[in-house]
Amino acid sequence: MTRVVLAAAYRTPIGVFGGAFKDVPAYDLGATLIEHIIKETGLNPSEINEVIIGNVLQAGQGQNPARIAAMKGGLPETVPAFTVNKVCGSGLKSIQLAYQSIVTGENDIVLAGGMENMSQSPMLVNNSRFGFKMGHQSMVDSMVYDGLTDVFNQYHMGITAENLVEQYGISREEQDTFAVNSQQKAVRAQQNGEFDSEIVPVSIPQRKGEPIVVTKDEGVRENVSVEKLSRLRPAFKKDGTVTAGNASGINDGAAMMLVMSEDKAKELNIEPLAVLDGFGSHGVDPAIMGIAPVDAVEKALKRSKKELSDIDVFELNEAFAAQSLAVDRELKLPPEKVNVKGGAIALGHPIGASGARVLVTLLHQLNDEVETGLTSLCIGGGQAIAAVVSKYK
C-alpha cells in the first residue's frame, strides 16, 4: 500500500474570543498558512492536487470557505478545494480524507487542515425569510447552536461533560487540578519557545500605523491556581462542577499541513515529518459524547498494528477536564506522555481547526526518542476520531 507522509505542518497562534483575530476571517487565517507552506517548501502551487479544510461555523463567510482560503493563499484556480464539517473532528477528518485520496491513487499532494473564527460567527434570525406578522422575535447564536449544542438533547456540550462527571464520579477538585496542570504545561512550553517551530505569526493590518503581528497563543495564563478556579461558578448546571476554568475556551485559529505520497515527497525533495499509520472513528450516545475517543483510539491502534504501550506521546483534545479525565481512566494513559505542552484548556479550542492543531503539535514533538504519537478528539453529537503517526525514517 502507498505510504502516506506528512510534511510542512504549521498552525497560527490561537486567539481568544473577541481577541486579536476578531476581525480576521477564518479563511484568511487558513490562507496565511497555505502561503507560508508554499513559500517554505518551494512547491509549485499547481502541483497540489486538492485542498481539504475543516470549518464548522461557515454561515456568512461565503461559498466553500476552503476554496476562498486556497485562492487567497496563492493557489491557482485549477486546484480544487472543499470544506469539511465534522464538528470538533473536522480538521483531523480533512487529513484522513486527504490520506484516503492518496492511498486510492486519486491524489499525490493534498493541503489539508482546519480553520475557525468563533468570534465572527453570526447571530441568526430563524424563520424570518418571509417576514413576521406580529410579535417579538429572537436571535439564535450560530456559534452556540451550530458549534456547541447537542441537537439530540438540546443542551450545551457542557452538560455532556456533567453527565460524565456523574458516571465516573469525577470531583470538582480533580477537574480544576487537571486544568491548572494544562495551563502550567502550556506556560512552560511557551516560555521555553517550544511552540515556536509550529506557529506561523499572523500580521493584522491596522487603519493607522504598522500591522499588529500575533506570535503567541492568547489563552495561556500564568497565574492560575486550584484555589482561584474553585471560586468560579458552574457554567452549565446549578449544582454542577464544570466551569469556564476547567473547560476549553472559545477561540480562533487555523492549522494546516501537506499530506503526500512518500514517492512524491522523494521526487520533490520534501522532507516528511511523519508517516500516517492509521485512523479510527467511533460513535456513542450523544449525551456522553466525551467518552467516544476510547473506542476511536482502540480502532486507530488496531488499524496501525500497534499497542497503546507503543505510543510515546499523546495529543488528546481537552474539550473539558471531566471528559479528558474520563478518557484517561478508561485507557489508563501514562500522564507524563499526555499533552506534555498543555492542551485545549490552556491553548484554546477553535473547533474546526483543533483536529489539525493537535496533530501539528504532535508532529513537532517527534524525534529519535519520541517516535510514535497518537491524537484524538471527541466530537459533538456523540463521535470521536483518532490517528496514529510515526516519525519518518
UniProtKB/Swiss-Prot annotation:
Pfam families: Thiolase_C, Thiolase_N. SUPFAM superfamilies: Thiolase-like. PROSITE patterns: THIOLASE_1, THIOLASE_2, THIOLASE_3. It comes from the Bacteria. It catalyses: 2 acetyl-CoA = acetoacetyl-CoA + CoA. GO terms for molecular function: acetyl-CoA C-acetyltransferase activity. Signal peptide: none annotated. GO terms for cellular component: cytoplasm. Keywords: Acyltransferase, Cytoplasm, Transferase. Its EC number is 2.3.1.9. The active site is at C88, H349, C378. It is found in: Cytoplasm. Belongs to the thiolase-like superfamily. Thiolase family. PANTHER family: ACETYL-COA ACETYLTRANSFERASE, CYTOSOLIC (PTHR18919:SF107), ACETYL-COA C-ACYLTRANSFERASE (PTHR18919). This is Probable acetyl-CoA acyltransferase. The lineage of its organism: Bacteria, Bacillati, Bacillota, Bacilli, Bacillales.
